[in-house]
């Protein structure tokens, strides 16, 4: 299903007959964690119930007050359930909700297979999270033909081979491609070329603009700016006066201006990361640490799946005023042990958080290598070896039997339901 069509020429012809020379795809897995779990269940048993068709979520420790929704089905979304929402709140909205515990090893494997398909067709890929990537398709029109037709074939191939759907947004830059992929879901291809902004982009509420948080949107509305189009036409100096440097970003984004290039990381600098946007404000350290643990589980599983090690951990914090704070720590030795990554993430968070209410948390790693340089005294070396073997055993058990087979204590109650 596509939202528009165009005829390729020497470049890519966009509505209005303008020839562009950059072609960017943003490929985003629909409800990734839930889709990957559903695809696995259907591969194992074709008669299994598809979680995507019922009121279901992937969630952490349901018995603890800070267990959160990690992914939701389309029908669960209709109840107003949001990613990052406490499971207790989700239950209140939908009493018959099916809660499935996370399987981080599955997510790592599914993400790798997803990216491998993109690597086969795209000259340059920038993986921006476990379930989404930008593809610079510039110059591929003569090889693949019409970009929209090719994007449709690509999403259909992903579904046929891997069992889950994706949305693909197409434009001349990363910002507009990402906005396009967020249009109607699931299993869609959408375009948002510059000539289409007046019709598809500017009528959207200002909250829809990527990078415009709720607090910023509220301030914009107080200034009479309610749509992206109104923001695009707003006085730039007025925006700078009210929002400082963010005013430039808002004005440029509303006008579809983005100079960010699709950049493939070299293997030597490859990193792993994951983040979650929260629909509620996190205001206590315990809750934040619990969310960090879930993120580190996924990141650690991906690192081990690639047989890699990392030596830098960074925590990203975005508060409810959209202020970004990052704290990075270098590890004494390269590792792929979840506990070590989590320990560093908590330390970085504790050092970097200014106690402002949090709306997004992220964990990323860098300086990846294919060798470990763990250096400990005899006691610590023994502890590391035990943790490493434990992580490896957990990965193998989860890979073979699913995440239900073995869980951390803080997730145990969820698995019993």
Residue ranges and their predicted role:
Residues 172-175, 254, 309-320, 358-369, ...:
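A glycine-rich phosphate-binding loop feature that marks nucleotide/adenosyl-phosphate handling sites
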